[in-house]
Curated annotation (Swiss-Prot):
Any one of the GO CC terms: extracellular region
Other comment: Crohn disease is an inflammatory bowel disease. This commensal, butyrate-producing bacterium, isolated from a human fecal sample, is reduced in some patients suffering from Crohn disease. In a mouse model of diabetes mellitus there is a significantly reduced population of Faecalibacterium.
Expression triggers: Transcribed in the gut of mice with diabetes mellitus (db/db mice).
Name of the protein in question: Microbial anti-inflammatory molecule
Keywords of the record: Secreted
Subcellular location(s) per record: Secreted
Main location: secreted
Length: 135
């Protein structure tokens, strides 16, 4: 069978490039599709959430439970928990007004920290060490 002069046999993912350019996601997908399974993607996403949550965990605890159990809690401090939690970044610096990106990333970090508290057991000092009583 004779093919037209402008016809060539190429793969479908290359045809995307001919028709207007391959995008980055298609290129990564073509390379990683044989390697990454659904389990790999799930593990990767879980690990990212865990890393972000670990970064925000201590500051989230300090700005919520730490305020309540500090020993010198006032109602004003309790009322400011939300402002301090969502208005300051993980380093404790205030987030600039109208900086939606930082507010959103801060909220996602706090959500990841709460997720970590919900899915993994915390270290129990009493369980892992010997507690001695002296009389």
């Amino acid at each position: 069978m004779m093919m037209p002069a402008n016809y060539s046999v190429i793969a479908e993912n290359e045809m995307t490039y001919v028709n207007g350019g391959a995008n980055f996601i298609d290129a990564i997908g073509a390379v990683t599709a044989p390697i990454w399974t659904l389990d790999n993607v799930k593990t990767f996403n879980t690990n990212i959430v865990t890393l972000v949550g670990n970064t925000f965990l201590q500051s989230t605890i300090n700005r919520t439970i730490g305020v309540l159990f500090s020993g010198n809690t006032t109602w004003k401090e309790v009322g400011n928990i939300g402002k301090n939690l969502f208005g300051t970044n993980v380093k404790g610096n205030p987030i600039e007004k109208n900086n939606f990106g930082d507010y959103a990333m801060n909220a996602l970090g706090i959500a990841a920290a709460v997720y970590n508290l919900g899915v993994a057991p915390t270290k129990n000092t009493v369980k892992e060490t010997e507690v001695k009583f002296t009389v």
